């Protein structure tokens, strides 16, 4: 059974702009490997304190089969991907369930 899922994420604790773009490139590769690259937008921004961060979200709900298995897999490889590029960065993945929202 598949469900519609909204994906959003942020990566904070980024050292500088070059590191932020390195994280973006690594996450774009991950999205390609997970076959959702064409459905997820990723970018770099600066918060009010002047710190760089990476954020992204799905352009529309993703149809995921066996989400209960894929979710922990994705969260694990997401965290590992970020850690490989920026060990001190803090990734956060958020899920939305549009079919349950009224």
Residue ranges and their predicted role:
Residues 1-28:
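Short, extreme N-terminal segment that most often corresponds to the first beta-strand
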Residues 5-7, 17, 39, 48-49, ...:
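Short linear motifs in intrinsically disordered/low-complexity regions
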């Amino acid at each position: 059974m598949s469900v519609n899922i909204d994906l959003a994420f942020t990566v904070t604790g980024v050292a500088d702009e070059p590191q932020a773009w390195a994280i973006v490139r690594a996450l774009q590769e991950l999205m390609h490997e997970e076959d959702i690259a064409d459905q997820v937008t990723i970018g770099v921004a600066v918060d009010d304190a002047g710190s760089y961060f990476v954020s992204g979200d799905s352009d529309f709900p993703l149809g995921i089969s066996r989400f209960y298995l894929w979710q922990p897999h994705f969260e694990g490889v997401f965290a590992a991907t970020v850690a490989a590029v920026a060990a001190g960065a803090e990734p956060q993945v958020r899920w939305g369930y549009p079919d349950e929202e009224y």
